[in-house]
C-alpha cells in the first residue's frame, strides 16, 4: 500500500507527524477536504490504484500531489451522464467507466442537472460544466459551520467576485523582495511603490511583507554582538537561518529537508545506513543527501525555495534528482554546515535518545562531542537555541559542557548572551566554567551584562564568576558595559560583588566616563557614591566633566561640580569643560561652570579663548555672558596663534551684531582690517572697514554707495530730537547702537574727533546695520530682540550692556 509523507507543520522541538497510510489519508481527506461529509466509496472499482470516490455527485480520484482535492472538469463524464436518467444501475456503470478512463483526475464536475431520485446526489443541484470551480480548502476552525450548508452554496461563495481571495507571493517575487530586504530592512515609501509596480503587487502588500520579514528577523535571525567591534561569532558559525530553523516536507521515501530528514534518521536506526560513514562528521560525503532528505527513493528530489518544497511526480512515478554533493561543500555548504543539518534532526525530542547509543568502537555511532568544520557541536547549538531538554540529555550522554567552537565560544556564553536562564542554570549545575572566555576575551558574565540579563548575571556571580575580567579588544569590564548600556540594577549588583567603580579600560576610561557620555544620572550617582574618581583622565585627557559638558547633561554636570570635580582640567587639545560647553552653545551648562569658578581666561592649544569660540560656534548672548562675568579678563583684541581676533572672525562670518558688540568693548577695527586685506577677503567687508578708518567727521559729501548714513553730528541730533519720518525712524532704530565712550557719562556724547582716537568711527555701525534686515534676530534673547524692534535700543555704558 502506498505510503504518503505528510508535510510537518511543526518546527524543531515539536512532535513529528510521521508516515500516514492510505486509509489514514482518506480519513484526513474526508475531514478537511469534504466539508459536507457526504463521502462514498464505489465498490465496483476496487482494482484501481487510487480509490475512486463519489463526492457530492462528483467522481473523485485522490492524488498525493493535490492535498486539497481541487476540482477539475472532465468532458468524458458527459458521454455517460445521460444514462443516469434511466436507472441507478446504468448510472453506476457510467460512473465506473468514467473513473477508469480518468484515473488521474481528482474531482470531476458532473454536468447532469436532471438526475432522478435514485441518483446518489438527489438532494443537490449541479452547476453547468462551463462553470469551472476551484474551491480552496477550508480550515478546521470553519469545518463545523459548513456542515449545514449545501455544496452549491459553498461553490457560489467561491465564485463571489466581492469575496477577498488571498494571493500567494510567487518564488520570483520572494527572491527579489528578499534581495531588497538584505540591503534595506526599512524601505521608504518611494522604494515600496517601485517594488509594487515591479512585482505587480499593491504597495500595502509590499509593506506588510517587509513588516513580517522584520518580525521574522527579530525572532529567528537575531545576530547578537558579543563585544564592541566583535563579529557575529555565534551565528556566523551556525550558518544559514533557513537551515537551522525550518523543517520542510518531502515526498517519497527519502524525505525532504526536515520532515524527510526524520525518515533519514529512521533509516539509520533501522540499520539502512551507509557503512562508510565518518564517526566524527556523521553521514558526511555523498551519502548525506540520501539519509537526510530529498525526494523519494532516498536520492533527494526536494528543492527548498524559501519555505516552498516542490516534489516532482509525473504519472505516479517519482523523478528523483540526486545531488551527489556533501552539505559541507559547494552551494549547500555555504547555506548550512553538516553540524547544523544534523542538529535540526538529532535535537528533535523523538530522536534525542538516539544519542545515548554512542559507542567509540562503532564507526557509525555519533560522537556527542564531535564538531564540524566551524567548530559547532550539538551541545553548543542546543544551548544557543534554548533547548533545555536536549541540553540535559546531551550532558547526561557525556557532552562536554565547556566545549568551544572555532572562535572560543562556550555553550555558557551562547546561553548568556541570549538570556536562556534555565540552560545557564543547567550548565552551571554540571560544572560549566563561568570564567572561560572566547578569543576576544568575552566572558559569560560580560555577555549577560551587555544583554541586561540580571538573573543570569546573579547566577554567574553566585558560581564565582570573575567580576573584573577584561576583554582583549578594549579592556572593558562587565561594569563598563553595564554603565554604557544603562543597566542600573546590574551595576549595583556588580558593585555589591566588589567591582571597582574606578576601574579603567585600555583607553583609561572608567565606568563613570560611560555614564556621563550617555547621560545616565542614576548610574553616575551610584558610581560617585561608591568612590568613582571624578577627575579620572582618559587617553584624550577628558574627565567625566568634559564628557557631560560636551553632551549637555546638566544634571550630571551639576552633580559632578557639587561633589568636587575640577572644572579647570585641560585635555590634550587644551580644552576645559567650559570650552566644550561654549563650543556646543550649552548656555545652562556654561552658567553652572561659571558659578563653580571655572577660569575664563584659559586658552586652547591653538591660542583661542572663549570669545573666539563664542564668535565661531555660539550666539551673541554667549559672548555677552562671558564678557560680563566676574573674573573675565579677556581682551577684545586678543588674537590666537594665527593672529585672528574675535572682531576679525565676526566680520569674516558676517555676524553684524557681534561686530557691533565687540567694537563697543574696544576691539580695534584696524587690526581686523589689516588681516582682511592681507588674506584678500571680501572686498565689501574690506571697503566698509576701510571707510570707517579713513573717513573724517566732516566728510558729509561722500559719494560712496556704502556710506549712505549721516555723519556723527546728524546721528547725535537724531538721538536728541524726535523724528516722525519713516526713514528717520529707521535711522533712529539703527542709531540706537550708538555707544558713548565718555568716562561714565551717558548723557552727553564726546565730540566726534575725540570718540575714537585713531581708527574707530561711528558710521561703521550704521552702514553695516543698514544693510542687514530690520527684523533679523541677533541673539537668542527674546527680550533683547523685542527691545530692538520697539526702538528703545541698547545702550552701552563703560563696557556694560544694559537692556
Curated annotation (Swiss-Prot):
- Single GO biological process annotation from the record: response to imidacloprid
Q: Where is the composition biased (Polar residues)?
A: 23-41, 125-138
Q: What is the protein's major site of localization?
A: nucleus
Recite the UniProt keywords alphabetically. ANK repeat, Developmental protein, DNA-binding, Homeobox, Nucleus, Repeat, Transcription, Transcription regulation
The residue ranges marked as DNA-binding region are 162-221
> Known InterPro entries for this protein?
Ankyrin_rpt (IPR002110), Ankyrin_rpt-contain_sf (IPR036770), HD (IPR001356), Homeobox_CS (IPR017970), Homeodomain-like_sf (IPR009057)
- Residue spans with biased composition (Gly residues)? 291-302
**What residue spans carry the region label Disordered?**
23-144, 288-330, 695-760
List the SUPFAM superfamilies.
Ankyrin repeat (SSF48403), Homeodomain-like (SSF46689)
Q: Where in the cell is it found?
A: Nucleus
| ANK repeat spans | 374-403, 407-436, 440-469, 474-503, 507-536, 540-569, 573-602, 606-636, 642-671
Biased-composition ranges, Low complexity, are 42-124, 696-746
Q: Where are the compositionally biased (Basic residues) regions?
A: 303-322
Q: Name one GO molecular function term.
A: DNA binding
According to the record, what happens upon gene knockout? Cells show an approximately 2.5-fold increase in the number of pstO cells and the size of the pstO domain and a concomitant decrease in prespore cells and the size of the prespore domain.
GO terms for cellular component:
nucleus
Any miscellaneous information on file?
A: 'Wariai' means 'proportioning' or 'ratio' in Japanese.
The function of this protein is:
Putative transcription factor, that seems to be involved in anterior-posterior patterning of the slug, probably by controlling the proportions of prestalk and prespore cells.
- Protein name per its UniProtKB record: Homeobox protein Wariai
Origin organism is Dictyostelium discoideum
